[in-house]
UniProtKB/Swiss-Prot annotation:
One of its GO terms (cellular component) is extracellular space. The keyword Secreted applies. Residues 1-24 form the signal peptide. This is Kunitz-type serine protease inhibitor nigrescinin-3. Expressed by the venom gland. PROSITE patterns: BPTI_KUNITZ_1, BPTI_KUNITZ_2. Its main location: secreted. Keywords: Disulfide bond, Protease inhibitor, Secreted, Serine protease inhibitor, Signal. The keyword Nucleotide-binding does not apply. It comes from Cryptophis nigrescens (Eastern small-eyed snake). The record marks K41, G42 as: Reactive bond for trypsin. Residues 31-81 form the BPTI/Kunitz inhibitor domain.
Length: 83
């Protein structure tokens, strides 16, 4: 396959992955964790997945510790934890 064909295939696979929602059975367990600002005093606007409301919500992260249900962008949160 030519390099142009490989690039096209890679682009199509990337687009498919971005547009395919994650089912609740495929959702990582950390998506069920509550928001956790951590003990530090930073003021970082980040997002977490609220499994009770089935929504992606913003919260203030202190900058350390916390848990894995913490995303820099709403798009990253959606890709990882979308229902």
């Amino acid at each position: 396959m030519s390099s142009g064909g490989l690039l096209l295939l890679l682009g199509l696979l990337t687009l498919w992955e971005a547009l395919t929602p994650v089912s609740s059975t495929d959702r990582p367990e950390f998506c069920e964790l509550p928001e956790d600002s951590g003990p530090c005093k930073g003021l970082f606007h980040v997002f977490y997945y609220n499994s009770d409301q089935n929504q992606r919500l913003e919260f203030i992260y202190g900058g350390c510790y916390g848990n894995a249900n913490n995303f820099k962008t709403i798009e990253e949160c959606k890709r990882t934890c979308a229902a």
